[in-house]
Design a protein with these regions (language model features):
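GHKL (Bergerat-fold) ATPase N-terminal catalytic module, capturing the glycine-rich phosphate-binding loop
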Residues: 1-188, 196, 430
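GHKL/Bergerat-fold ATPase module in large chromosome/replication-associated machines
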Residues: 117, 135-157, 177-187, 192-626
């Protein structure tokens, strides 16, 4: 026996492997269990292709043994095992992967579909040195008579020698480090810790992972006393729920899995279970919660799906699998097609992941579309909870996703107590109606009281009520729907008149030009114009906006954190040409006209939901007029 150096013999490289690539020391167990599963897969594959191998699937298992006194963890499998040469190649060369080579060599074998070798890079084994200062590997290759022992204490090298081992397989012993001021290594010798780590990372490895577990049970001979019982238990569930056929799974199984996996007390609102084959093959189990997570609206909330590779947890929250507008979706994806980086924790942003993300996005949209069509009550409940995310999705990224989301939007409306889709609105439009009308406000009740609403409804036109801050921004990204443009009824250029009505109102404005100019001057730059209008029904006055920034946009933009209150809509004060107040204004003195004008302006601001610029001045003027 002689000591050998690693072929990638740099201590710096090994230090990088165990200190930089992996951010959580606990994943060493996941890596070793995955390696053991790979080894069993290889022998199981051999049993499928070689009749001389008399082994059945139920013969395979992975053992974990803990010894607190010697501070060791032992992971044993009865898989394919390794020869001295394979130990040299697989463990003596950092980043050499036997599993990857095995997959490559058997890529064309149809029976290779019956196994699922996890490893792609030969780095996982070296994560052992994050928790152990010495690692011992005893392995006997299937069909060989001689076993070999590989021993290393880290970057200084390793030894290989012959040894005794009765059966084929591999036994890895980790000599756990002593605790330090900053690190508790002893916890990895506790059965509770190991049990939890297996359930967290390796619950769906398809071979039994067994360990002796001790439990305190009542002593039947002495009341009040307990005795310790030790028995071998299987720690993993082995069969992932998402790998089963949907027809075999009861709704309560989906619900219980969700509540246990994602720590929710309520059943999910909707379950999406899909298997996709094609450019990328994957299983996905997705949940739409009934209620938003408690931290959903906080900066700390992290979106993402759990990502598995052949049943092994690779990433707890893979944000790249979900667009922001579906950030509320919980669930997981399991695929063997993903290209893994040298650490399973650092998934490459590769082409396969993008294909999967695109397929998931499409699947969720299709499910929501079906829900909207077939279960309206359920969809309205969903939209009330998460509809805001879809609206932001329309607005975000310059409207890149608007076409895929626009038919999922719901809005309150003047025509019904129930919310409507854009498609439904257009389907109800009057023959004479060319545009989609909307108004913005704090809630539907306040919007319904806007002066402009009356005239639009008198025409037989429906008005969409935009009650979320993002609504108008999203609609401006859409620009039009089914060839119909969106029109804000609170803009000064709202056109509901025929030619004769337009001619009449133009003449009235021309005749009252001197009065209107005085009123504009009285407002001292607060408005860009004062004009008479025929679109207010029975109401005396309103504020409208001209240009891009609407009244609602002004409120929203100036309410944002850090806003400098500099965003202003170009306001227009509109006076009802048919209201008696016009005659009052025409007969007023210059001083009274100024007071009337400011009162009307302040009243119009209140009606529009804007703050008064000078409440005291308004109150004094009102009292004076009384």
């Amino acid at each position: 026996m002689r000591k050998k150096q690693f072929k990638a013999e740099s201590k710096k490289l090994l230090d990088m492997m165990i200190n930089s690539i992996y951010t959580h020391k606990e994943i060493f167990l996941r890596e070793l269990i995955s390696n053991a599963s790979d080894a069993i897969d290889k022998l199981y594959f051999k049993s499928l292709t070689d009749d001389s191998v008399k082994l059945a699937r139920e013969d395979f298992k992975i053992h974990i043994d803990l010894d607190k006194e010697s501070r060791t963890i032992k992971i044993t499998d009865n898989g394919i095992g390794m020869t001295a040469e394979e130990l040299e190649n697989n463990l003596g060369t950092i980043a050499k992967s036997g599993s990857f080579n095995f997959k490559k060599e058997n890529a064309d074998n149809e029976k290779a579909d019956d196994i699922s070798v996890i490893g792609q890079f030969g780095v996982g084994f070296y994560s052992s040195f994050m928790v152990a200062d010495k690692v011992e590997v005893i392995s006997k290759a299937f069909g060989e008579d001689i076993a070999h022992k590989w021993v290393s204490s880290g970057a200084d090298g390793y030894t290989i020698e012959e040894c005794e081992k009765e059966n084929a397989g591999t036994e890895i012993t980790l000599y756990i480090k002593e605790d330090t001021e900053n690190e508790d290594y002893t916890k990895y010798l506790e059965q509770y810790t190991i049990n939890e780590l297996v359930k967290k990372y390796s619950d769906y490895i398809r071979y039994p992972i067994v360990m002796e577990m001790s439990h305190q049970v009542p002593n039947p001979d002495k009341e009040g006393e307990y005795t310790t019982e030790v028995s071998e238990e299987t720690l993993n569930s082995m069969v992932p729920l998402w790998r089963k056929n949907k027809s075999e799974i009861k709704p309560e199984e989906y619900n219980e899995f969700y509540k246990q996996k994602f720590m929710d007390y309520s059943d999910p609102l909707h379950v999406i279970h899909t298997k996709t084959e094609g450019q990328a093959t994957f299983d996905a189990l997705l949940y739409i919660p009934e209620n938003p997570p408690y931290d959903f609206y906080s900066k700390e909330y992290e979106k993402g799906l759990q990502l598995y590779s052949n049943g092994v947890l690779i990433m707890d929250k893979c944000a790249d699998l979900l667009p922001d507008y579906f950030s509320f979706v919980k669930g997981l994806v399991d695929s063997a097609d993903l290209s893994l980086n040298i650490s399973r924790e650092m998934l490459q942003h590769d082409h396969q992941l993008k294909i999967i993300a695109k397929a998931i996005d499409k699947k969720i949209k299709n499910e929501l579309t079906k829900m909207l069509k077939n279960d309206r009550e359920k969809y309205e409940k969903f939209f009330k909870t998460f509809g805001l995310q879809l609206k932001y999705g329309v607005y975000a990224n310059y409207g890149m996703e608007k076409d895929g989301l626009k038919d999922l939007l719901l809005f309150e409306t003047s025509a019904d107590d129930k919310p409507t889709t854009l498609k439904e609105y257009v389907g109800r439009m009057a023959d004479s109606q060319n545009d989609i009308y909307y108004a913005c406000g704090e809630n539907a009740q306040k919007i319904a009281l806007l002066p402009q609403i009356e005239a639009v409804k008198e025409k037989g036109y429906e008005v969409l009520y935009f009650t979320d801050e993002v609504d108008e921004f999203a609609i401006q990204m859409l620009m039009e729907y089914d060839g119909k443009h969106f029109v804000n009824i609170c803009k000064d250029d709202l056109d509901l008149s025929n030619d004769a009505e337009k001619e009449a109102i133009t003449k009235k404005n021309d005749d009252a030009k001197e009065l209107l100019d005085k009123m504009k001057d009285a407002l001292d730059g607060k408005v860009t114009a004062v004009k008479l209008t025929n679109k207010l029904g029975s109401h005396p006055v309103c504020l409208s906006a001209e240009g891009y920034v609407s009244l609602e946009m002004e409120k929203v933009l100036n309410s944002m954190p850090g806003a400098n209150q500099g965003v202003k809509a170009q306001l227009v004060l509109e006076i009802n040409a048919e209201h008696p107040i016009v005659d009052k204004l025409k007969g007023a003195s210059d001083d009274d006209l100024k007071k009337y004008t400011n009162l009307l302006y302040s009243s119009a601001r209140l009606i529009a939901g804007l703050d008064l610029e000078n409440p005291t001045e308004f109150s004094d003027a009102l009292a004076d007029m009384m």
